[in-house]
Swiss-Prot record:
EC numbers: 2.1.1.222, 2.1.1.64
Disulfide bonds: none
CDD domains: AdoMet_MTases
Species whose genome carries this gene: Pseudomonas putida (strain W619)
Enzyme class: transferase
Name listed for the protein in its UniProt record: Ubiquinone biosynthesis O-methyltransferase
Reaction it catalyzes: a 3-demethylubiquinol + S-adenosyl-L-methionine = a ubiquinol + S-adenosyl-L-homocysteine + H(+); a 3-(all-trans-polyprenyl)benzene-1,2-diol + S-adenosyl-L-methionine = a 2-methoxy-6-(all-trans-polyprenyl)phenol + S-adenosyl-L-homocysteine + H(+)
Binding sites annotated in the UniProt record for S-adenosyl-L-methionine: R36, G55, D76, L120
Length: 232
């Protein structure tokens, strides 16, 4: 059975043409991207690394990592976002290899090939997140690192990530997220450990609606990222 939710893919297919519009529904992704890339780069030094971006969408993170000197492959199952990523690459001149393939299928093809894997804002959009995590373990080299980000599952996350972001502030289209698919840090940590990845660090990402700014924080109640290591 394929670990693909076609309804989730359809959501982003419909919005794909606005992926690089910084005032569109993707503004939050553009705003948080520098914070996330810096956090990752500080931990792995992206320059010269072979990197896989799982669930790359229109390529916002992929291009940013390539600009840091990484050799980046971006994968996604959405045809329209990948087309946008490839078109933007022609405009920007940033070199990224994009492929329409699942993490599980690529793991069969390219085991232990990547120094770093990123899988940001993707796990809450697939039927079986643990399957993606296992695939990431298989693809990262021993001693390599895998970064995940997602949204916590609790009342505060429901209020801020769905009611606040989708209905009140209208930062995201209604229906972007499904609360049932949100993932607690304890669950993400457990799936990672079962897959063979050691959790090294966790950081939260908070939004101030008054200043309209994001910052990294110890508060992991809503958005958060984790750093994991495949031991040598």
């Amino acid at each position: 059975m394929s670990n693909v939710d076609h309804a989730e893919i359809a959501k982003f297919e419909a919005l794909a043409h606005r992926w690089w519009d910084r005032e569109s529904e993707f503004k939050p992704l553009h705003d948080i991207n520098p914070l996330r890339v810096n956090w990752i780069d500080e931990r792995v030094s992206l320059a010269g690394k072979k990197v896989l971006d799982v669930g790359c969408g229109g390529g916002i993170l992929s291009e940013a990592m390539a600009l840091r000197g990484a050799t980046v492959t971006g994968i996604d199952m959405g045809e329209a976002p990948l087309a946008v990523a490839q078109l933007h690459q022609l405009e920007s001149g940033v070199e990224v290899e994009y492929r329409q393939i699942t993490a599980e299928a690529l793991a069969e093809e390219m085991p232990e090939q990547f120094d770093v894997i990123t899988c940001l804002e993707m796990l809450e959009h697939v039927p079986d997140p643990s399957s993606v995590i296992r695939a990431c373990y298989r693809m990262v080299k021993p001693g390599g690192q895998v970064f995940f980000s997602t949204i916590n599952r609790n009342p505060k996350a429901y209020l801020l990530a769905i009611i606040g972001a989708e209905y009140i502030l209208k930062m995201l289209p209604r229906g972007t997220h499904d609360f049932k698919k949100f993932i607690r840090p304890s669950e993400l940590g457990a799936w990672s450990r079962v897959a063979g990845l050691e959790v090294k660090d966790i950081i939260g990402l908070t939004y101030n609606p008054l200043t309209k700014h994001y910052k990294l924080s110890s508060d992991v109640d809503v958005n958060y990222m984790i750093q994991t290591l495949r031991e040598e």
